[in-house]
Structures are given as structure tokens and as C-alpha cells.
UniProtKB/Swiss-Prot annotation:
Primary location recorded for the protein, binned into one broad class: secreted
Keyword field contains Hydrolase: no
Organism for this UniProt entry: Mus musculus
Name of the protein: Cerebellin-2
C1q domain mapped to chain residues: 88-224
GO CC terms of this entry: extracellular space; glutamatergic synapse; synaptic cleft; trans-synaptic protein complex
Leader sequence residues: 1-51
Gene Ontology terms: biological process: maintenance of synapse structure; positive regulation of synapse assembly; spontaneous synaptic transmission; synapse assembly; synapse organization; trans-synaptic signaling, modulating synaptic transmission
Keyword Methyltransferase belongs to the record: no
Length: 224
């Protein structure tokens, strides 16, 4: 009997197995991973990504930007982490007041000469105080105001001024003695700071009548 590993005429030659061929896919996968990693490293160099820094402005080209923030600021604006201010719905401000009864002199009106209104038609934001008939600006911005103060069966000339923080800004007159009803009317755009106050003041004459004809209105055109 020949010894193990021995043939009839000499030692047997061992043939190499085919296990080495099974390693080729693993070697190929490793090479592919290395190539992909290299491409990822080279990508920023060939295709730079624009990022914001302290000096570069944000450039939006044909894209919509949606900013959400659950903590709006006190003036109704929402400021994102990118420093972009977005006005919320609470930034809407408008009022319009009228009278439901005739203008009658009172101790308060004789002392302050303020023209009072007793009915609010619109008061978005509740920044017009009916008791004092004073509007208080909730934020800095450009505001529009208009007024129509009617005198009825009164031959005296009246002068009505729109007051900002106690100082007259514009005035209107009604003094035609040949008509029974006449209105002192005017309008203006004002730059107002937060908590600035606006009201109407009778600078001259007396107010009698004017039931439901006198109005005072204003609204925020845009905030600053």
C-alpha cells in the first residue's frame, strides 16, 4: 500500500484550490468603496457650496423660503435664525370710530377740547381707546389717518387739528355760513414710534350736532 500522499510512482502533487477566486468580489468591493470615498472628498472642491457668513447676504434665486418660529417678538414680527423678519397676522392695525349721538359740550370736552367718539366700527388690534378717543401706536411704522368732523346749524367757524403726542400735525376748517351742514376734513400719513398717541382736538369754535356724520379712522400702512 502506498503511503498517504504517495502515488504508485512517487509523491502526489497537490493542486491549488479555487478559494482564491472567491476573494475577487471582496477585493472589488473594497476598491469601489475607496473610489466613492475619494469622490466624496473631492466633491466640495469641484462643486463649492455657498454658505452664509457674517458678510455675505442671503441670496434666494427662484426659491420660496418658509420661516417658522413659535416665539414672535413684541411688535408682532417673527425673526428666524437667519435674521429674516416675517410679519405675523397680529401686525394688522386699523380703527374707525363714529358717533351714535349728537356732539354736545361736556365738562371734559370743554376742558380738554378733545373730540370724543362713542361708537367703534372697526378696531383691529384694539389700539383705539373709545373712552379717551385716543389711538396708541403698537409699533413703529407708517400710519394713515383721516377725519371728518361735521357742524350742523352752526354759523361759527370750527378748526379741528389732528394731534400727535400733544402737538398739532394737520388742521381742517369749516366756516361757510350759507350752509346748514359742513365738515372739517383732512388726511395724512405719519411716521409713528411705538406708543405714540393721536387724537382730534377742537382748536376753535363749538360743535353742535353732527350725529353719525363725524368719523375718525386710521390704519397701519406698513411697519418699520
Amino acid at each position: 500500500m502506498p503511503a498517504p500522499g504517495q502515488g504508485p510512482r512517487g509523491p502526489l502533487l497537490s493542486m491549488p484550490g479555487r478559494r482564491g477566486a472567491l476573494r475577487e468580489p471582496a477585493d472589488f468591493g473594497s476598491s469601489l468603496g475607496a473610489v466613492l470615498a475619494l469622490l466624496l472628498l473631492l466633491l466640495p472642491a469641484c462643486c463649492p457650496v455657498r454658505a452664509q457668513n457674517d458678510t455675505e447676504p442671503i441670496v434666494l434665486e427662484g426659491k420660496c423660503l418658509v420661516v417658522c418660529d413659535s416665539s414672535p417678538s413684541g411688535d408682532g414680527a417673527v425673526t428666524s435664525s437667519l435674521g429674516i423678519s416675517v410679519r405675523s397676522g397680529s401686525a394688522k392695525v386699523a380703527f374707525s370710530a363714529t358717533r351714535s349721538t349728537n356732539h354736545e359740550p361736556s365738562e371734559m370736552s370743554n376742558r380738554t377740547m378733545t373730540i370724543y367718539f362713542d361708537q367703534v366700527l372697526v378696531n383691529i388690534g384694539n389700539h383705539f381707546d373709545l373712552a379717551s378717543s385716543i389711538f396708541v401706536a403698537p409699533r413703529k411704522g407708517i400710519y394713515s389717518f383721516s377725519f371728518h368732523v361735521v357742524k350742523v346749524y352752526n354759523r361759527q367757524t370750527i378748526q379741528v387739528s389732528l394731534m400727535q403726542n400733544g402737538y398739532p400735525v394737520i388742521s381742517a376748517f369749516a366756516g361757510d355760513q350759507d350752509v346748514t351742514r359742513e365738515a372739517a376734513s383732512n388726511g395724512v400719513l405719519l411716521l409713528m414710534e411705538r406708543e405714540d398717541k393721536v387724537h382730534l382736538k377742537l382748536e376753535r369754535g363749538n360743535l353742535m350736532g353732527g350725529w353719525k356724520y363725524s368719523t375718525f379712522s386710521g390704519f397701519l400702512v406698513f411697519p418699520l
